[in-house]
Amino acid sequence: MRTATITRETKETQIYLTLDLDGSGRSEIDTNIGFLDHMLTLLAFHSDFDIKLTAHGDHENSGMDPHHLIEDVAISLGKCINEALGDKLGIRRYGSFTIPMDEALVTCDLDISGRPYLVFNADLSGNKKLGGYDTEMTEEFFRALAFNAGITLHLNEHYGKNTHHIIEGIFKSMARALKQAISIDETKVGKIPSSKGVL
């Protein structure tokens, strides 16, 4: 069973997350940020991960920006992915997927390499808010996820106008690429997918 559970409590956030990489796309998401809930639900559905997440942050009572919560959710999700993958024996390792989301086109390319890195090319400047979600936090979300999951992650917006569509394309393409990368390669069962013998 490729599963993981994390409880993360700081002075700013309280997070409980369970993850099953070999699920069916079911999710129960509650971050009190509607747009983030929507994106994480899409991530679960398109990756076939089962995700149960409850997250609360200092912004709920203070009126502060939910920056800490968004980043800590990504940290927790990244840690769970890394833990659930375990020794990574037999995984395909690489994933690549392009999503057309109406007028927007977004590609995710990733390598479960153990060498975390993020390349993020999407124009989300302008301090837009979507349901309490600061769109500029999207890059920070994926940086935290990549560095805690041990993933080399490239996210590229080829073009697009609608911010919601661009971000949705990013989450969906990431989900589909992850689904590819964590799947088992029947020709490499029981083997580390690296010529070095370690990831």
Swiss-Prot record:
It catalyses: D-erythro-1-(imidazol-4-yl)glycerol 3-phosphate = 3-(imidazol-4-yl)-2-oxopropyl phosphate + H2O. CDD domains: IGPD. Its main location: cytoplasm. It is found in: Cytoplasm. GO terms for molecular function: imidazoleglycerol-phosphate dehydratase activity. Its EC number is 4.2.1.19. Pathway: Amino-acid biosynthesis; L-histidine biosynthesis; L-histidine from 5-phospho-alpha-D-ribose 1-diphosphate: step 6/9. GO terms for cellular component: cytoplasm. GO terms for biological process: L-histidine biosynthetic process. InterPro entries: IGPD_sf, ImidazoleglycerolP_deHydtase, ImidazoleglycerP_deHydtase_CS, Ribosomal_Su5_D2-typ_SF. Gene3D superfamilies: Imidazole glycerol phosphate dehydratase, domain 1. Transmembrane segments: none annotated. Keywords: Amino-acid biosynthesis, Cytoplasm, Histidine biosynthesis, Lyase. It is an enzyme of class 4 (lyase). Belongs to the imidazoleglycerol-phosphate dehydratase family. HAMAP family: HisB. This is Imidazoleglycerol-phosphate dehydratase.
